[in-house]
């Protein structure tokens, strides 16, 4: 993943934002900004952050990579993570998804700029880096869906 944090386009986006007083407010503003910069395009392969910005659209990995880039350019450690999350789309199901973790106040906080979530909902299930990478590759060659076969409650 190439993070163009020094890109003129990224710097312009950050300069156009109000300057939040705390890391928590900055994270919320960055989630909203990343969400507003792109329109979701379901079947578009993930590309570079700058390509997604130029097109004005992207899929979840593009939203997540844009957030990672903006956060790092603003001085916050951030990373893109992969897993599964429940989508209420045309065919509600758990699907492959990308979102972010950002370090604030000594703790990693999950955020989802695709769905404009400053706090992740309970359906985000992070996968290991190896499994996440394998699912990312598989999602480009075929549709990846998970089906709940059984559920139980405490």
Question: What is each stretch, according to the model?
Answer:
Residues 6-8, 15, 59, 101, ...:
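Glutamate identity and glutamate-enriched acidic tracts
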Residues 65-149:
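Hydrophobic/aromatic-rich core segments of domains that either
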Residues 7, 27, 60-65, 97:
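Short alpha-helical patches at coil-to-helix transitions and adjacent helical residues
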Residues 1-57:
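Acidic low-complexity segments
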Residues 153-154:
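Short, solvent-exposed mixed-charge patches
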Residues 31-37, 50-82:
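Structured core of small recognition/catalytic domains
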């Amino acid at each position: 993943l190439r993070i163009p944090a020094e890109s003129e386009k990224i710097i312009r986006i950050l300069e156009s934002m109000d300057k939040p007083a705390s890391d928590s407010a900055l994270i919320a503003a960055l989630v909203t900004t990343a969400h507003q910069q792109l329109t979701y395009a379901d079947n578009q392969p993930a590309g570079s952050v700058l390509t997604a910005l130029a097109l004005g659209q992207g899929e979840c990995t593009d939203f997540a990579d844009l957030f990672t880039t903006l956060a790092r350019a603003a001085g916050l450690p951030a990373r893109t993570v992969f897993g599964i999350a429940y989508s209420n789309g045309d065919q509600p199901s758990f699907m492959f998804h990308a979102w972010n973790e950002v370090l604030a106040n000594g703790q990693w906080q999950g955020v989802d700029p695709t769905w404009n979530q400053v706090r992740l909902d309970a359906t985000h299930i992070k996968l290991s880096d190896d499994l996440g990478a394998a699912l990312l590759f598989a999602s480009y060659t075929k549709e990846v869906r998970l089906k709940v076969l059984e559920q139980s409650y405490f």
